[in-house]
């Protein structure tokens, strides 16, 4: 693995950093308070190529590598973890899945507007009774000849209320277990497709999380992704890459909290000196810096392996497992270093602490990552 970033990668990192400072930081506290989706900012992210970063330019993407994606995600998440998850889902779950597995016709129709940021997408796998146990899908898509008839409920869908296109995983033949699952592209506005109320969340409150209700929705045959029965393998393959996105989001949350804590520790005085001169504080910062660097290396490793076409189930899971733990630990300590100030909203660290928790839950809980890693190393 080459640790020297190229000129182009450094430029992308700087562009994302500038964008986050200038466009995401203003209003981030209010968007968190009001659960307000960053509509204008996401539009600009699309114009900058941040919503289809790794997609071939012939399908509207920016044609960049996955390390650039990690760098940009970290910068965006440092300032606004909600905008970062919108970016992660659109890039890694929706665009990457379509680019790799969709038909040419589907790519032209759906991938191009999604990768160029004209619209955003969502990925609907989780259900009220099927989160970690993803093969237990209750949503059904019955083969009716010319079309499939979709019925069921999806839960906790990121971009659920703002997406135009949804990748929906559903059971087509329960007898066949995971080989009887398919993935479909469903358009917002189709008859029988209803979007449930917005979830009132602990963190990433600027992102838009809804349940989706399908009541006899007709899906044209041409909107199935891949061969019949490919849906579960599709979801697993897509989630492997998605975990790099969430690991990078977690990395950004951690490094954002660390930078704020370091700055504070260098200026805040207690017992006649800046608090960084107290070993109790300095050692916390030393641990944070070490863990963040290790998390970044795991993200780079998984991203480099992805671009080399290697199996990233293990490296993606390791990056997500570790970076999300670092996000949680670092943000808790950042609040602690800030003392009473850390507990109020204007210092940002309490928001980052709330935002961190979800990175241990979505796109596979930490426990699921350990299943993936342990099965891989046992092979
Ligand atoms: N990569 C590629 N393929 C995989 C895989 C992986 N990481 N894990 C499993 N598979 C494949 C297996 O090879 C097998 O395929 P074949 O039969 O063709 O060989 C098939 O999937 C079934 O595998 P298992 O028998 O191992 O399946 P299982 O029932 O034991 O479950 C699991 C495996 C890893 C636990 C899986 O269910 C899982 O990953 N669960 C977590 C789901 C998840 O991440 N949900 C998050 C929701 S999406 C979200 O959060 C989005 C958002 O909005 C932010």
Where are these regions (language model features)?
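Helix-loop "lid/cap" segments that line or gate small-molecule binding pockets
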Residues: 92-100
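Alpha-helical interface subdomain recognition
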Residues: 1-89, 101-106, 113, 117-118, ...
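A short, Trp-centered hydrophobic/proline-enriched beta-strand micro-motif
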Residues: 117-125, 169
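Flexible, small-/acidic-enriched active-site or ligand-binding loops
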Residues: 136, 191-220
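Long, acidic (Asp/Glu-rich), low-complexity accessory segments flanking structured domains
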Residues: 216-233
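A short core secondary-structure module
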Residues: 147, 151-195
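Short Ser/Thr-interspersed hydrophobic loop/turn segments at strand-loop and sheet-helix junctions
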Residues: 49, 73-77, 170, 186-191, ...
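Short Gly/Pro-enriched turn/cap motifs at secondary-structure boundaries
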Residues: 114, 129-132, 156-159, 173-175, ...
């Amino acid at each position: 693995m080459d640790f020297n970033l190229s000129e182009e990668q450094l430029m992308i990192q700087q562009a994302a950093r500038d964008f986050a400072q200038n466009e995401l930081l203003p209003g981030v506290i209010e968007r968190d308070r009001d659960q307000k989706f960053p509509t204008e900012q996401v539009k600009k992210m699309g114009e900058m190529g941040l919503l289809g970063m790794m997609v071939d330019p012939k399908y509207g993407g920016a044609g960049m590598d996955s390390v650039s994606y990690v760098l940009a995600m970290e910068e965006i998440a440092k300032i606004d973890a909600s905008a970062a998850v919108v970016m992660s889902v659109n890039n890694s779950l929706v665009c990457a899945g379509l680019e790799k597995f969709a038909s040419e016709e589907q790519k032209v129709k759906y991938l191009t507007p999604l990768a160029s940021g004209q619209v955003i997408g969502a990925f609907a796998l989780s259900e009220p009774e099927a989160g970690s146990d993803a093969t237990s899908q209750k949503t059904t898509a019955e083969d009716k000849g010319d079309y499939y008839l979709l019925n069921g409920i999806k839960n906790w869908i990121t971009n659920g209320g703002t997406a135009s296109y949804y990748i929906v995983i559903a059971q087509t033949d329960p007898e066949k277990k995971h080989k009887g699952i398919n993935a479909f592209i469903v358009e917002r506005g189709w008859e029988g497709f209803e979007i449930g109320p917005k979830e009132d969340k602990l963190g990433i409150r600027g992102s838009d999380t809804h349940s989706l209700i399908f009541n006899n929705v007709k899906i044209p045959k041409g909107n199935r992704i891949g061969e019949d029965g490919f849906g579960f393998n599709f979801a697993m393959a897509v989630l492997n890459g998605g975990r790099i996105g969430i690991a990078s989001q977690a990395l950004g949350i951690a490094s954002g909290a660390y930078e704020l804590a370091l700055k504070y520790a260098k200026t805040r005085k207690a017992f006649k000196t800046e608090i960084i001169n107290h070993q109790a504080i300095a050692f916390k910062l030393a641990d944070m810096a070490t863990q963040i660097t290790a998390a970044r290396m795991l993200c780079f490793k998984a991203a480099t392996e992805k671009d080399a076409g290697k199996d990233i189930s293990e490296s993606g899971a390791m990056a997500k497992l570790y970076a999300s733990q670092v996000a949680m630990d670092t943000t808790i300590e950042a609040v602690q270093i800030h003392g009473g100030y850390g507990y109020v909203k204007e210092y940002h660290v309490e928001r980052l602490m709330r935002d961190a928790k979800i990175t241990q839950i979505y796109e596979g809980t930490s426990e699921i990552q350990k299943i993936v890693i342990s099965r891989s190393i046992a092979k």
